[in-house]
């Protein structure tokens, strides 16, 4: 299984350290890839969101499930997320998680996504969101395999 996370913006160095930490742990479960997009500048907020959304969509793995991370999405427990991941893994599919930049994502991409999940009702930076998604993917695989980590 391949998991790609496409994020609208560059990651800070302290986030990259955490990303490397979880990518190392995830090696035995799946292949992970993080794609950082350059921030879009110029124009109205709506124009920026539209351009960033188009760039995110271009990076979706062919044939993968497109999962958008957005505060308007469905809130899942770690166990429910593990169930989702297990189902996708059993179907032999890959997943591309899309995380928008500071202005978020367009309504269009929310309607095109296979699933829309929320990490929390709180707002996180795009970098923190990447780190949280990676940790939850790792936690999900540990739950699926019945290994100690999640209590």
Swiss-Prot record:
GO molecular function ontology, one term from the record: rRNA (pseudouridine-N3-)-methyltransferase activity
CDD domains in the cross-refs: RlmH-like
Catalytic reaction equation(s): pseudouridine(1915) in 23S rRNA + S-adenosyl-L-methionine = N(3)-methylpseudouridine(1915) in 23S rRNA + S-adenosyl-L-homocysteine + H(+)
Any one GO cellular component localisation term in the record: cytoplasm
Coiled-coil intervals, chain numbering: none
Positions contributing to S-adenosyl-L-methionine binding: 100, 119-124
Catalytic activity, EC: 2.1.1.177
Alphabetically ordered keywords of this record: Cytoplasm, Methyltransferase, rRNA processing, S-adenosyl-L-methionine, Transferase
Localization in the cell: Cytoplasm
Highest taxon, organism lineage: Bacteria
Pfam families for the chain: SPOUT_MTase
Similarity section: Belongs to the RNA methyltransferase RlmH family.
Complex formation: Homodimer.
HAMAP family listed in its UniProt record: 23SrRNA_methyltr_H
Function, as annotated: Specifically methylates the pseudouridine at position 1915 (m3Psi1915) in 23S rRNA.
Protein name: Ribosomal RNA large subunit methyltransferase H
Species the sequence originates in: Thermotoga neapolitana (strain ATCC 49049 / DSM 4359 / NBRC 107923 / NS-E)
